Amino acid sequence: MDKVVIITGGSRGIGAETALLAAREGYRICINYHSDEKAAHGVLEQVRALGAQAIAVRADVSSEDEVIALFHHVDAELGRVTALVNNAGTVAHKSRVDEMSEFRILNILKTNVLGPILCAKHAVLRMSPKHGGQGGSIVN
């Protein structure tokens, strides 16, 4: 089975390290990022230096339209997804909970809760034998 992974929040930290590990394990890799294109392309260069086929794709995982576009891009460039690492997340930096706006709270929930569910939904639509897939793995 071909190994294709999407790593959300793949431009730094745990996501970047996961991309490097996936490269060593022979995966074709999509490094998803939300805002730091420069960091994502830095990870992309490192992954490619290890011999992996890889792309960097900007998408806001809290938007189903953007998640759909992300998965379609990966389908076209790398093939059917066989693994998903839901790593993207956001926190309330320098905010006290009693000072957080409803907008900020909803943004955190959309990214950290809705995002992984949307990504898992679209991964399962590709991985599940019910939908023509051959199985796969999702890491949350």
What are these regions (language model features)?
Residues K3, A52-Q53, R80-V81, M127-N140:
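Active-site loop of short-chain dehydrogenase/reductase
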Residues S95-V97, R104-L109:
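Substrate-binding pocket helix/loop in short-chain dehydrogenase/reductase
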Residues E37, R58-L70, E102:
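The beta1-alpha1 cofactor-binding region of Rossmann-like NAD(H)/NADP(H)-dependent oxidoreductases
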Residues E25-G42:
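Conserved glycine-rich Rossmann-like NAD(P)H-binding loop of the short-chain dehydrogenase/reductase
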Residues S11-G13:
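Conserved glycine-rich cofactor-binding loop
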Residues L50-Q53, H73-L84, H93:
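A glycine-rich helix->loop->beta "capping" turn
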Residues A120-K121:
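A short, exposed helix-loop element centered on a Lys and neighboring polar residues
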